[in-house]
Amino acid sequence: MLATTRMPAFADDAFWAKAGEPYKGITLRGVSESTPSSNWAKDVIAKEFTEKTGIEIQFETTSWDQMYDKAIKDMEAGSGIYDFVYIEQDIIYSYLSRDFLVNITQTLKDKPDLAAPTFNMEEFTTFIEYFKGKDGDLFGVPMEAFIKPYLYRADLFADAAVKEAFKAKYGWDLAPATDHKQYREIAEFFTQYGQDNDLELWGTTVQASSGHPASFYEFVESIAPTFGVYNWGLNTETWAATVANGGTMNSDKAKAALTWWIGNLQYAPPESTSSTWDEVAASFSAGRAAQALVYGENAAWIATDENKSTVVGKVGVALPPLEPGVLEEAESGNGYIGYYDGGAYGIPHSSKNKEAALLWLQYYSQASVQTDWAVNAARVTHKATYDDPRVQEQDTKTNGYYSLMRDKGHLFGGAPNFPFHGQLREAIAPYFYDAITGKLTPDQALDQAAARAEEELTRLGYRKA
């Protein structure tokens, strides 16, 4: 724990003014993906930080791929363009293996005058553990964390005529799907319902961009686990991917998962084969789908912001549909039911303003700024945030999104600890694109992806031929 005492607000302000004095007038440059969380940090929290410290922040929010390209090229070259970078949970292990990041724990020990009295690692949720190195030191300070739940149109699911028609056709009471067969039947029903009633409505979304890693991530992080396939289908002891060598990437479960997912495209809006996480949220918020797996960072605005969403007050939230046994595996710690996403800001070794950047990382981590951030961006990094009355009010408006994350978040998992994350993704994602376009069948795609994965992991030195 870096700090154990809390100070009155005026004392807090005095700390920031004094700590920022040596760096007053300098400009910190940061790069992040343009997400609800980062945009709130840029538009609100960064301005407060500047007012209290005199340190300016030039905050670049851009697309996911551009964000990574800019940050990695800067850190590889050591050019020092950026003083802080966004670190998504799934890439932290690659950054640590390449020694890109400043050790925050050690720096605060070495420079105690920079340690803010309002920065307390004990206040964070367990999500902070993802950003620690092998010795337990912190290399990134979380700024967002959220699950990827199942959203559904609560108004449609509660409509008496809809419920009657659904039960007449399928023989069970319409409710959020608990397994994949139910999900498919709901998708089929509402797609037909949209056609029959001349509505721009389909039964589901699919994050199936045929040329963007978003589709790969949807499958390995959100779909495959619900069928009982974890860690991308890799055997984490031998780094095998094929069933023949002890992996599960091309197992029967994995093939059933990919077949089901690709099959959902016939019940999804036409934009689905060009949809990343952003387009999925846009499709659902426009009322174009009856159900969807949506990154939680979008849950709040979809359910509450009438300026951006047409389904305000009409959104329900639930756990993803699961195959038998998957929930029990997750509850016992031997699996997970979906993706626990999020990110942190970290300081590159190449930064020319490390001390000032460290103040910024601590500033946005204060308990005092968490409530507004959570309400507006559906992210929670501090345990106490869930108990705040305003967050509880927003929980009601979102039909229980925050309480679902609090109570069931432990069933979700972050990305596996793969230092080769990026290399392997690039090697095997094209097979998933080919399955989406129909160039390969799901079975062919997984057989070829598994073989290519073993080839790549052998080349990288992880798997022995």
Where is each model-derived feature located?
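Hinge/lid segment of periplasmic solute-binding proteins
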Residues: F10-P22, Q89-P149, F219, G316-P321, ...
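Long, aromatic- and glycine/proline-rich binding clefts that accommodate carbohydrate-like moieties
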Residues: F10-W16, T27, F131, V315-E331, ...
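Short, polar/charged alpha-helical segment
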Residues: A14-A19, P36-E56, D155, I428, ...
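Extracytoplasmic "Venus flytrap"
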Residues: F15-V44, F146, P416-P419
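Short, well-ordered beta-strand elements
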Residues: K24-P36, I55-E60, D83-F84, W360
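Extracytoplasmic "Venus flytrap"/periplasmic binding protein-like
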Residues: K47-E123, D137, A160, A165, ...
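Extracytoplasmic/periplasmic substrate-recognition and gating elements
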Residues: L156, G263-P269, N307-V380, F412-G413
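Glycine-centered hinge/linker elements that transmit conformational signals in sensory
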Residues: Q182-T191, S222-S274, G316
